[in-house]
Amino acid sequence: MSVTTNAVADAFAVFDVTPDPDELARKNKKPDDSGSVTVRQLYRYANWLDLILLAVGIFGSIGCGVLTPCQMLVMGDMVDTFNTNDLMKAFPNQEAMYDPKYYIPFNHEVTKTVADTINDLVLKMVCFAIGSGVGSFLMTFCFFVMSERQGIKIRMLYFRALLRQDAGWYDFHESGELTSRIASDVQQIQDGMSQKFGIIFQTTTSFIAGYAIGFAKDWDLTLVIMSMSPFIVLSMTLLAVFATKFTVLGEESLGNAGAIAEATIGNMRTVHSLGQEHEFCEMYNEKIRVVDRYNVLKGLTVGLGLGAVMFFIMGAFSLGSWYASVVLRGKGGKKNVTAGDVMIVFICVLIATQGLSIIAIPLNIFATAKASAYRIYQTIDRIPDIDCRSTAGECPTECNGNITLEDVQFRYPTRPTKQILGGLDLEIKKGQTVALVGASGCGKSTTIQLVQRNYDPVGGSVKLDGKDLRDLNIKWLRNQIGLVGQEPILFACTIRENIMLGARDGETPTEEEMIECAKMANAHEFISHLPEGYDTMVGEKGAALSGGQKQRIAIARALIRKPTILLLDEATSALDTQSEKIVQQALEKASQGRTTIVVAHRLTTVRNASRICVFHQGEIIEQGTHQELMDLKGTYYGLVKRQSMEEEVDQETVENDLKKIREQENKEAEEINQHKNTDTNEDPDIVQKLENEYNSEMKKLKHSNRFVLLRVILDNFRHEWFLSTFGFIGGIGGGAIFPFFTLKIVDLIMCLLSINSDTLTDDQKDTIKNICIIVVVIGVASFLSFFMYIGLFLSAGFKMIGRVRKDMYHSIMHQNISWFDRKENMVGSLTTRLASDPTTLQGISGERVGNVIHIISTIGFALGIAFYYDWKVSLAVMAVSPVLIVVVFINGKLNSLEACPAQAAYEKSGITLVEAVESVRTVQSLTREEHFYEVFKDALREPKIGIYKWAPLLSIFMCLTTLLTQVMNPYGFYIGTYLIKKKSNYDLPVPDFMIEFSDRFEEMQKAIMAVIFAAQAVGNLGNIVPDIGKAVRAAKNTYDVIDRKPTIDCYSEEGETFNDVKGEIEFKDICFRYPTRPDNSVLKGISFKVEQGKTVALVGASGCGKSTSVQLIERFYDPTHGDVLLDGHNIKDLNIHFLRSQIGMVGQEPVLFAESVMDNIRRGVPKGVEVSNEQIYAAAKMANAHDFISAMPEGYNTMVGDRGAQISGGQKQRIAIARALIRNPKVLLLDEATSALDSESEKIVQDALDKAAKGRTTIVIAHRLSTIQNADQICVIMRGRIAERGTHQELLDLKGFYYTLAMQQFGTVD
C-alpha cells in the first residue's frame, strides 16, 4: 500500500510546480490594511493542478447544491399526483361516484396509476441522489487534496520567508510569535480551503437553485417570500464584518501568547531557577484572556446574526403562506398554479434558507482563514533589504580578505537614537589578525555583524577587497567567512551533522577532514569517548553537552569551512583552561594566511594579534601590537594589569604536563569502560529502571484518556454551566423547529390542495391564519434558539479552548527538566501542540456541541413526529438508518486516523522551524537556509504522501453518507405508496375513498417529511464527524500533557520548610545519569561538603560533571544514587519552591526575556517579596550594570529584545548577575558567571560577587582560575569523580592536574 501511495504522490509531484513567491509578490496586488486577503489572494500559490482540483471540487459542490432542490421538483409532481380535485373530474356526475360499478374499478385504477407514477418519480429521485453522491465524492476528494497541498506549500513558503528575513526585521519580531503562526494561522488557512469551502459553494448553490426553481414555478410567490432578503443580507454582512474584526484582534493576541510560550519553554532551567513559573503563567493567561474576550464577542455576533437571519426567513414564510392562498384562488389569472408548485416553492426556498444556517460555520472558518492568510502572506511577500536569497551582486573569482571600514556609523533599528558606532575607521589587510577589545557594549560585536552584513551601516561603508559589501552577493560573502560566536549554537542533530553544517555550499568534506577539524578544536578526544561518538545526538540547543563541548564543536564547524575570513567573537570564552590553550593554538594556526578578527575579553588570547584595537563608545581610542600598547601605558595597559598577566608560559613544560594529564584521563577512561559502575554503589539495574519508568508513564497516560471525548464535553458544561445550559436549551428547542415547521408546510399543502374555488371557506381561512401566526412564533423561537445554541455555545467553546490552552501551558511550566530533555518534548514540538491542539478541540466543543445537540434534537423530534403519524412508513425508512450511522462513524474514524501521522509530521517540522528561527543568525552565517528548508520539507513528506492515501477513503464514505441520506426520501415515498395501495378500502364510494386516500397521504407526507429532516440531520452530522475525529486526537495529545504529574513538581506545596536557613550544602556519594542517556554515567560517587558561608570551586575539563552538580543542587534532576543535603535536610524532602528561593544562580549562557531591563532584574525576586526600585538599582550597581543601563535612552525601561538580542553579551551577563543578587540568596551558584565580561567589568563584578558571597554558601564553576584563588576549597573533577581537592596553594603544592591548569593560565606559579 505504501509503495503504491508513494508512487501516486511522486506522480502528482510532477505537476507540483509552485509559483515563485517573489514573482507573485510583484504581480499580485498587495493586501490592503483591512486585515484580510481576497479569495483570489488566498489561492495565490495554487498551481494549475490545484486550480483543476479547485474547479472540479467546486463543480462537485455545485452539483450537490443543485440536485438537492431539484429533487423537490419531483416531490411537487408527487403532490400533484394526489390532487383529489383533478382525479374527481373523471366522473361525469356526482351520482356516479356512489355507483359500485363505477367507483370500484375507479378506485383500483387510481391507486395503480398513483403507484406507477410514484414509482417512476422515485426512480428519478434515486438518480438525483446518485448524482449528489458523486458530487459529494468530487467535493471531498478535490478539496481535501487541494487544501492539504496548499497547507504544505504555504508552510514551506512561510518557513523559507522566515529564513530569508534580515536581522533588523527580527529585532522587531519575537521568534515565538513568528513560529506559533505556522501552527495556528497556516492550519486555519488550510481549514478554510478544505471541504468547508466546498460547503459554502454547496449551500450557496442550493440557495440560488432553490430560489431559481421557486421563481420558475411561481415568481410572485417566491418574490413575496424573498421580500425579507435585504434584511437577511444585511444581517449576514454585519455578521461577517464584525466576526472578521474580532478574529483579527484575537489572533494578534494569540501570537503574543505564543511568543511568551516559546521564550519560557525554551528556557525552562532559567524559569525554574527563578521560581517564575506562576508569573509567566499569569502573563500568558492575560494574553489568552484578551483572545477569549474577542472570541466571545465573535461568538455572540455570530449567534445574533444567524438568529436574525432565521427570524426574517420565518417571517418570509409566514407572508408566503398567506400569499399562496391568494395564488391558488386564481387571483390575477394564476389558476394554472398547482398545490405541487406551491409545495416546490416552499420546500426549495426552505432548503435554500436552511443552507444559510449551515453556511455560518464554514463562512466563519473561511473568514478566519483570510485573516490568517493576511499575516502569513505579509511575511512571505516581504523582500528584506539584506536578502540572503538574492542572486544579485558580484561574486569575485577570488577573495583576498582585505577589510576596510570607512567612517562607519551605526544605530540599531530598534534604538535609532542610540549611536553604537560613530565614524569608525578600520583597515585589516589580508592575512592579518586584528583583535577588538574594550568594555561590553562598546561596539565590538556590532563590528563583527557589519562584516557579516547582518546589518548595513547608516553611514559610511564596509568594504572587502575594495568593494562595498552592498555590491557583493550576500551568499558569496558569507561563504568566505567562518564565525564562532560568544554563545555557541548547535542544532538538534548529531555531532557529525553539526560540524558538516559548516562546510561551504556545494562542498562535502571527507570523514578525515571532519575529524581533523575536530582535533584542531580539541573536540575529537571527548567525542570519541561518547557512547555514539560522532553520531551522538547533541539534543535541543546542544543540551546533551557542556558549554565547553558545544563551543569546541562550533569551532570545528567554523574550521571545516576553510574560510578566507575568520570571525572569533569570544570563541574560547566557554572553554576550560586546558582546552582553551590547545584551541587557542589551533585558532592561531588556522588564522595563518586568513584575515582574522578576534573579539576577546581574555587578553591572553590576543597577545599575538597583528594589531589590537581598543574600543570605547563606538570609536577606536588605541591600536597597535601588544607590546606597543603596553609601552603606551594607556587603556589597554590598564586592562592587562587588571587581568594580572605575567610572563609567557614555558610552552614545553606545559605540553609535557598536558601529555601526562591526557594519559591519566585515557587510562581512567579505559578502566571505566572495563568496569562500568562496579566501583560505585549505584543500582546495577538503573538503566533498565529508567527505561521502565518512561514506558510505564506513557502507558498510564494513554489509559487515562480513553474517555477523552466525554471529558471535554463535561468539562465544557462544568466550567461554562450558564452558557452551556442555555445553549443546551437552545439546541434542544432549535432541533424542534424544523420538524414542526414541516408539519405546518404539510398542513399548508393539504389546505391548498383543498382549494377548488376563488373563495376560501372559513376552515381554510382559519387554517391559513393559524399557519401564518405559528410560523411567526417559530421565527421568534428560531432567533432565540440560534442565538442560544450557536452564540452561547460558540462563546463557551472559545472560553474552553482558552482554558485548555492555559491549563496546557500551566502543566508544561511545572514539568521537571528531564521531561523537556525528551525528543518529543522539544520546544518546537511543544509550541506547535500548544498552538494547534486546543484550536482543533473546536471539533468537540463550542458550536460543534451545539450543532450535535441541535442535530440529535432534530432527529428525536422528527422521528417522534414520523412514528406518531405513520409508524410503518417511518419504521421502513428507518431501516436504512443503521447503515447510515455506521458509514458516518467509519467516516469519523478515518478522519481521526488520518490526523495522527499528519499531526506527528507537523510537530516534527515544528521542531526544525523553532530551532532554525531561534538561531536564524547562525543559520544565515552558515548559509544553510536551503539545508534547513530541505529538512523542513522532508518532515512534511509524510502528510504529503498521506493526502493520496486517505483522500479516496474519506471521499468514498462521504459519498455514501450523502447517497444514503438522499435515498431515504424516495424510499419513504415508495414504501408509503405501497402501504397506501395495500391498505386502501376499494369498496368505499369515491368521496369517502378520496377522503381516506387524502388522509393517508397527509399522514404519510408528514411522516416522510419528518424522516427526511432526520436523515438530513444525520447527513449534517456526517459533515461534523471529520472534525470530531481530529478533535478527539488533539484532545488526547492535550490531556497527555495536562494530566502528567511531574516527579519534581515546582507547584507542589508538599515538602518541608524551615526557618534560619544557613546554606550548608553536602553531596553524599552522588551518582547520576541523565534520564535520556541512561547508558552514560555522568557523576560516579561524588562526595563533598560546603560549610555555611564558605566558597567551593569546581574546576575541570568541559563535560566532567561540574554543571550537572549545580543542576542537582537546584533539583532540576534527582541523583540516581546518593543524597544532596541542605542544612542536613535531604532536598528531596524539602518544598521545591522553598529550596529554589534560597538559591541564586548565574549560568554560563545568560537568558533574558523580551521585556525591560527592570522587569528582567525583578524576575529574580522570590514570590511574595516586594522590592523597591532603589533595591534594583543597588543590585545593578553591584553587578556593574547601573552605568550602562542609565546611559541607555530609556534607562531601566529599555526593552532588551527577544532573548536579549538588543544588548551585548557582557551586558546580558551583568543583568543576569543583578537578577541573582536581588534574590539575596543563602546559596549562590555561579556557573561561569563572568565568562562573558570584559576585563574591566570582570574585575569589578568579581569584587561584587566576592562581596555578595560573604555570609553565603557559594559554589563556583570557573575556567579562569584567577576568579577562584580565594575559594575555601577547590574540587578538581575528572570524568565524574573528584580527583583533587584543597585550597589553591595546597593544590599547587600537589603539582597535579590543577597545577598544570594554573601554569597554563599564569605562566609561572609561585
UniProtKB/Swiss-Prot annotation:
GO terms for molecular function: ABC-type transporter activity; ATP binding; ATP hydrolysis activity; ATPase-coupled transmembrane transporter activity. Residues 55-368, 722-1030 form the ABC transmembrane type-1 domain. Its main location: membrane. It is a multi-pass membrane protein. It is an enzyme of class 7 (translocase). CDD domains: ABC_6TM_Pgp_ABCB1_D1_like, ABC_6TM_Pgp_ABCB1_D2_like, ABC_MTABC3_MDL1_MDL2. Pfam families: ABC_membrane, ABC_tran. One of its GO terms (biological process) is transmembrane transport. Its EC number is 7.6.2.2. Residues 403-642, 1065-1304 form the ABC transporter domain. InterPro entries: AAA+_ATPase, ABC1_TM_dom, ABC1_TM_sf, ABC_transporter-like_ATP-bd, ABC_transporter-like_CS, P-loop_NTPase, Type_1_exporter. It is found in: Membrane. It catalyses: ATP + H2O + xenobioticSide 1 = ADP + phosphate + xenobioticSide 2. The keyword ATP-binding applies. The chain crosses the membrane at residues 48-68, 125-145, 196-216, 223-243, 299-319, 342-362, 721-741, 773-793, 849-869, 871-891, 945-965. Glycans are attached at N336, N402, N608, N816. Belongs to the ABC transporter superfamily. ABCB family. Multidrug resistance exporter (TC 3.A.1.201) subfamily. Energy-dependent efflux pump responsible for decreased drug accumulation in multidrug resistance parasites. PANTHER family: ATP-DEPENDENT PERMEASE MDL1, MITOCHONDRIAL (PTHR43394), ATP-DEPENDENT TRANSLOCASE ABCB1-LIKE (PTHR43394:SF27). This is Multidrug resistance protein 4. It comes from Entamoeba histolytica (strain ATCC 30459 / HM-1:IMSS / ABRM).
